[in-house]
């Protein structure tokens, strides 16, 4: 059932007449088994347990499938990375052929997605700049967003996928597997991802995988930001994160968002933002990726508009207007 602005009065009337009936809302995610599905499940549980609202995860085929339903108010919330809202807003790239999603609104930065480019540990490549001309996954026909993510990492060193020997793949998971099979020389990898752990185990005779460091300078950051808003960060070594050697590795991070639409009532979005902010520990306990949720940085500069209900809450806690990460 929908919780649109037009239906708010009738929903409240039903609540009063029926003993505060909960209005069931949806949060759209990628398919069951995906990272976004797990995160969406955690968010829906916290919101349902801590507010008068009932929120249920709704897995779909992918962002290009569920963004139109959010834009039209058919689903109240969803999870998107930092690039998808901008593409959907303009109707380009993986949203080409769809009307611009001008009703889309941002609600919260929910966690950071850490990623980097890895090579075999015994490979001769020591820096990203050393990768020019090597074999790398390309095209990402089923996951076009990843093309921009990979080029953003490479832009840190003044490179792009066009500087490489391109090996066409469907998605970045296939690219990681090709590194494990030594059919590419370097591949984009999610930090601590299950597939990265599998590839690392497969390459133990070569010492496993090794992430290449990004350069943390204003000039390098400027090159990255010409493609997408992403930032270098220092990842400390951990037994759960293969490829990060002693002393840590400077990798890339970018944001994942809770999104909604202009159809959804301000007080509903306010409640969701406030509840997520106040339950960081519960969220972190529910899924490892939500340990990267920072309640002190829930807003971020973006070309897509923020929902008024979210803005109201961020003004109350001193997070509006949003600031770029340091």
Feature names for model-found ranges:
Residues 1-10:
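Bacterial N-terminal signal peptides that target proteins for export
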Residues 16-22:
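Sec/Tat signal peptide C-region and signal peptidase I cleavage site
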Residues 24-50, 54-56, 113-181, 300, ...:
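Bilobed "Venus flytrap"/periplasmic-binding protein-like clamshell domains
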Residues 39-45, 58-98, 117, 173-178, ...:
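Pocket-flanking alpha-helical
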Residues 67, 76, 163-228, 311:
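Ligand-binding pocket segment of bilobal, Venus flytrap-like solute-binding proteins
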Residues 97-110, 239-249:
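A structural signal for short loop-to-beta-strand junctions that line the ligand-binding cleft
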Residues 209-271, 313, 321, 325:
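C-terminal lobe and pocket-closing loops
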Residues 276-293:
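Periplasmic-binding protein-like
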